[in-house]
């Protein structure tokens, strides 16, 4: 998953 996409969904994923 792309960090940018995760942030858009409201998820905080590093990497």
From Swiss-Prot:
- Keyword vocabulary terms for this entry: Methylation, Ribonucleoprotein, Ribosomal protein, RNA-binding, rRNA-binding
Q: Which GO terms describe its molecular function?
A: rRNA binding
**PTM:** One or more lysine residues are methylated.
Q: Name one GO cellular component term.
A: ribosome
Q: What does this protein do?
A: Forms part of the ribosomal stalk which helps the ribosome interact with GTP-bound translation factors.
The record's subunit annotation is: Part of the ribosomal stalk of the 50S ribosomal subunit. Interacts with L10 and the large rRNA to form the base of the stalk. L10 forms an elongated spine to which L12 dimers bind in a sequential fashion forming a multimeric L10(L12)X complex.
Q: Which family does it belong to?
A: Belongs to the universal ribosomal protein uL11 family.
Tell me the protein's name. Answer: Large ribosomal subunit protein uL11
